[in-house]
Design a protein with these regions (language model features):
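C-terminal helical subdomain
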Residues: 186, 205-245, 252-254, 278-285
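Short, small/polar-rich loop/turn modules that mediate ligand/substrate recognition or access, typified
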Residues: 178, 183, 245-247
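Active-site helix of classical SDR
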Residues: 126, 162, 170
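Alpha-helical segment proximal to the catalytic Tyr-Lys
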Residues: 131, 175-176, 243
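Residue(s) in the substrate-gating loop at a strand-loop-helix junction
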Residues: 146
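Conserved glycine-rich cofactor-binding loop
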Residues: 10, 15-19
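Substrate-binding pocket helix/loop in short-chain dehydrogenase/reductase
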Residues: 101-103, 107-112, 210
Length: 285
């Protein structure tokens, strides 16, 4: 429950216009944080600013920025400091996937783009936020991973690799900057009801596999998590209650990591054929 513990905290949330990022921004602002959200689509950002109702003197601001651009990240951090007077936290939420399929058919350009968005984008946020948090006497950085970063998710291409990379970055940064009271942790969402997951038909086998492998699914009306579930954890990790937590990753997955990841082969195999799925070259290669 919000109690104003984040009053005056300057926090940057990347990818803050929709889904999980927006929920993180809301959870922070409701508790008094001065939140700056960034993303590539201004209309999504302004919609989020208009919809969020801050509390305890909090506020929400926005800046258009692409986390794969170092100049944009530098500007987003500067805007956060200008809005709040200092930087106390970052939720590096911007990310995404693409290129479903086995590794023998991965497109190099698409693979590199996913790594750049997730890993390089997060690194740029670390690079430019750390000096500001050190100047503030400390802070908290939350990297957005996924259960796909540590649990097998066949045919997810670069996404699993990218999320594992974010977790490795959070561990190393926690070790490097603990002396300056800057903490780094990762959140591992499972299936969360966001726009990004709308491509999974709710009446298909892939979604059914999520439900079968999520212990809490029968106790939920939808069987999946909500963005606010992730936002609540992000608020905790940014806040003072988590002062002695760093270098770890926390699941928000309804227990799915206890069982098995999804199998997306039903999406992919009809177009590729069993030979290609088994590792053979495509006929037109």
């Amino acid at each position: 429950m919000a109690d104003g513990a984040l009053r005056g905290y300057g926090v940057l949330v990347t990818g803050g216009g929709t889904g999980i990022g927006r929920a993180c921004a809301e959870a922070l602002a409701v508790d008094g944080a001065v939140v700056t959200i960034c993303g590539r689509t201004e209309s999504s950002l302004t919609d989020a600013v208009d919809a969020i109702r801050p509390g305890y003197g909090g506020s929400v601001h926005h800046v258009v920025a692409d986390v794969t651009s170092e100049d944009d990240v530098r500007a987003a951090v500067a805007a956060t400091v200008a809005n709040a007077g200092s930087l106390r936290g970052v939720v590096a939420n911007a990310g995404g996937g693409g290129g479903l399929g086995p590794y023998n058919v991965q497109d190099l350009g698409q693979f590199e783009a996913v790594l750049r968005l997730n890993v390089v984008g997060t690194m740029l946020c670390v690079k430019h936020s750390v000096p500001e948090m050190v100047a503030s006497g400390g802070g908290s950085f939350v990297g957005m991973s996924s259960i796909a970063g540590h649990q097998n998710h066949p045919h997810f291409g670069a996404y699993t690799v990218a999320k594992a990379g974010i977790e490795a970055m959070m561990r190393n940064a926690a070790d490097e900057f603990g002396r300056s009271n800057v903490r780094f942790n990762a959140i591992r969402p499972g299936f969360i009801a966001t726009e990004m997951m709308d491509f999974v038909p709710r009446d298909g086998e892939v979604f059914a596999s999520y439900l079968r492998n999520t212990p809490l699914a029968p106790a939920s009306d939808t069987g999946v998590g909500e963005p606010s579930d992730v936002g609540a954890l992000a608020r905790f990790l940014i806040g003072p209650e988590s002062r002695w937590i760093t270098g770890t990753a926390i699941n928000v997955d309804g227990g799915q990591a206890l069982r098995a990841g999804p199998n997306f082969s039903s999406f992919i195999a009809p177009g590729l054929g069993d030979d290609v799925m088994a590792g053979n070259r495509p006929a037109d290669d």
